[in-house]
Swiss-Prot record:
Binding site for ATP: T58, V59, G60, G61, S62, G63, K64, T65
Record-level Gene Ontology MF annotations: ATP binding; tetraacyldisaccharide 4'-kinase activity
Name recorded for this polypeptide: Tetraacyldisaccharide 4'-kinase
Catalytic activity: a lipid A disaccharide + ATP = a lipid IVA + ADP + H(+)
Top-level enzyme category: transferase
Keywords, sorted A to Z: ATP-binding, Kinase, Lipid A biosynthesis, Lipid biosynthesis, Lipid metabolism, Nucleotide-binding, Transferase
Pathway stated in the Swiss-Prot or TrEMBL entry: Glycolipid biosynthesis; lipid IV(A) biosynthesis; lipid IV(A) from (3R)-3-hydroxytetradecanoyl-[acyl-carrier-protein] and UDP-N-acetyl-alpha-D-glucosamine: step 6/6
Pfam families: LpxK
Amino acid sequence: MQSWVNKLWYQGHPLRFALWPLSLLFGFVTWLRRVLFSLGLKKAAKLPVPVIIVGNITVGGSGKTPTVIYLIELLRKHGLKPGVISRGYGVEIDGVRAVLSGDRADSVGDEPAMIVARTQVPMLVGAKRIDAANLLLSEFDVDIIISDDGLQHYQLARDIELVILDGERRLGNGMLLPAGPLREGPWRLQNVDHVIVNGGKALQGEVQMTLQPSAWLPVSTKHNAGEPPSKDSPLVAMAGIGNPQRFFDTLAQQGYQVEHTQTFDDHSAYSESVLNELASGRMLVMTEKDAVKCRDFAKDNWWYLAVDAKLSASFDQQLLAKIDRLVADK
């Protein structure tokens, strides 16, 4: 399914023209919804603390989660106490739920499980971000909120909007859903505070971000880990993220010998039997997002590659200066 969608959205498949009328309808509905909020006919809830939206205008992975983790660490160093809210993609949540370190990804969502495992940040997930934000403020010592995704969730007023773009895929064929990958038109990029480009090359006015490998870590928390992956031994690599090829390319650039690669759809659930068959006793490597879904049954020779987002000092300074102004005005 994912490979077919990639052909449609990123490789010029002619079927996109047949879907164009549906894209026009989708575009009208999203435009009308935004207009209703901008005119005040639909109300956006304002919070007593600054709200940062980390989102995108395309469907699929672009690097939002590493960006959220980067922001959490940046804000903490600046003396702030961030909290995070998320929809919890792909899971059914009754009301609002706190995400705890060790929670299963199939209960709270892949990205929330990964964010909390890495940062132990106060984080709530729920279908209604407003409810999650209000509960976060009432139950935790938080003075700034980061929304993981939610750029198009206009019910929540925001102070800063950060859009993450895949620097290699950019906007694909430039068409709205379902003919293309866009949730909103390219014009939306002109209305956000920063466009952050993950990989590739940022254009003028955009912010360059790179994902730098930091360490090999064992997937399992139950076994004593053996030796981490070596560049002298063949590996089996898997990835169930928005752009799996980026992970495989990273391994190649680092000089690892990848014997076999296996892609899964983004947000796939994994079974022990499928991954055991894939690995067949060999060393299996994966992304951090995949690892949070495999910990309960991982073998001691399964490893994930932790990566850290890197952005410029000038971006940090601009962002923190705006946050300081917002805090003073709240």
